[in-house]
Structures are given as structure tokens and as C-alpha cells.
Amino acid sequence: MRALITGCQGFIGKNLAEHLKKQGHHVTGIDKKLKVGDPVYVHEFIGHDMESTITIENDFDRVYHLSADVPNSKGVGGSQLTTGRSNPIQTIQAMDFAAKNKSHFIYAVSAMIYNTEYQGHNGPDLNEDEHIWPAQPAGNIYGMEKLYNMQLAIEYAKAYNMKIALPIFHAMYGPHCDILVNSKVVAAMCVKIIQAEDPGEIEIWGDGTQIRSFCYIDDLMIGLDKLIENDIQLPINMGSDEAITMTQLADMLIKISGKKIEKKYLPAGPAGCMRRNSDNTKIQKLTGRKPNYPLVQGLENTYQFIKDQLTEK
């Protein structure tokens, strides 16, 4: 099997490349450029801006489209305008290439597509059939364009008789995560704890009661395989079944660190929605997929990876 990964140098792209290579597949990757000293995880790397037409002559059995500009609450990454303009163009370029080559197209959907009215303190576990529509995704443009691109992929599949997979990613974490520039919740908290004095203190945005379910990266890889093996072409959650608060997450990581650290809450900080938890009923029913990695095991692996990375730097 020959696979093409867009955004191959990102967190998920690196893990996916390693996963596919271990299975014996040939992996080609596309990204804008290599960072100095950044290893390549694919067999063949192509420097390319995904806003431009893909002109690769090779045929691919699968196209995994991970490339995206992601604005975040710290102002790092693309602006709202950059995200709203760039990501649909990138996705159309990837889908045009997949349609032309009759490739199985796997599009990385975000849990930010879910209607925000269901993400309050007493909100339900989010499922694909009841909580996406009517459309009211997260307040920034990223959730909106992800929802638009998901629907566009469905239309491409109809028009070009193209196989698709639409995994909805819920708070992924694990080795190869970004730790200093565009870090997500788990990685950012690991960095804070590792860099804190002992005894010391870390800051937590919000009041600590925000709830998330974090999915370990290896569980995502298994889930992607299951979607393709079972030819599931519906939007489908990729999450874990362990929902925890930010305070609980901090306590688990502090325990892993072995340090004595106090928590300082910043209620005025960007806390995000109050509750976003994945309902995994559909994927379990259709594919039998269940998360294999308990949260504590995934956090231990991730904490050690980040600690090693910071030590090397």
C-alpha cells in the first residue's frame, strides 16, 4: 500500500508515518518545509505548500489529509483569517488529487465541529448523529471550516465515487507532540510541571472544572485502521472514554512528576468550552474499536517523552 500524508511533520503526521511504515507500507509526506534538525519520518518527503496544486506523478492508495493552519488561544499559529482562507483551499487541493488518483481519502475532522450549545457543564457526551447539527461550531473559524470541509468531502465522495473516512479527533496527545510553540493541553501542562521548581506552582486557565476526554495517539492509529478496514465513510468519533477535569489532569501529571506543586487558577484565562467528551458508541458498534491505553499510561509515556525532549534542548 502506498500512502500520502499531508502535514507529515506535525504531531499526528509523524505518528501516522511511523505507524504505516511499521505495517510495511510506503509513505510519502508533504509539508511546507523541514525545521532545522527535525528528523523525517516518511520514506519520501516533498516540500510543498498545500494551497497549490499537487503535481506528484505517483499514484497512492490512500491520502491522509492532516495539513491545516490552527489558530490557538495563545495567538500562535495562523490567524483567524489565515485559517479561514487557507484550510478550505488546502482541503480542496488534497481532495482533487485523491479524486484524480482514485485514492481513499481520509480527512482529519476536529471535535470543534460540535454545536457549542451541547458543551456546557451539564452537556451530554457528544455523538455524531445528535450534536453536530444544527451547525453552531466553536466560536473561532477553525471549527466552522472543519465542518464545511467535512461536508465537502461527503459531496466529493458522491460526485467522484471516491472512498472517504471522516474521523473526528478528540484532544489527541502522545509522543511527537508540539511542546514549545503550538502545544495542546496535555503537552502544555507537562511543560509547566517539568519546568516548575520543586516545590513550586503552575497556572491553570479557567477554574479547573473544564472537562475533556484525551485520546492517546496510538489509540487513534488503531481507530484509523479500523475505519479503513471496515470501509466506514460516516463522520465518526475518535476519542477516549475517560473524561476528566483540568484539575484532575494536573493532579495526575503532578503525581507522575513526583514534585510538590500547587495549582494557581486563572478564571479570566482562555478556558474553552466547559465540557467536551466523546461518545464512542458508534465506532465500537461498527468496528469493535475501544481505547487500549488507560489515561495514566498515556500520560506517563507523554510526560517522559516531553521531559526527554526538554532535556535534549
Where are these regions (language model features)?
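Flexible, glycine-rich beta-alpha linker
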Residues: 113-116, 141, 165-186, 211
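N-terminal Rossmann NAD(P)H-binding glycine-rich loop of SDR-like oxidoreductase domains
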Residues: 3-23
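NAD(P)H-binding glycine-rich loop region in Rossmannoid oxidoreductase-like domains
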Residues: 47-88
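Conserved Rossmann-fold NAD(P)-dependent oxidoreductase catalytic core, especially the SDR/UDP-sugar
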Residues: 92-141
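SDR active-site strand-loop-helix element
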Residues: 6, 30, 63-69, 105-111, ...
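C-terminal substrate-binding subdomain of Rossmann-fold SDR/epimerase-dehydratase oxidoreductases
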Residues: 195-313
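Conserved beta-loop-beta element that borders a ligand/cofactor-binding pocket
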Residues: 109-110, 150-175, 198, 203
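Active-site helix of classical SDR
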Residues: 141, 145-148
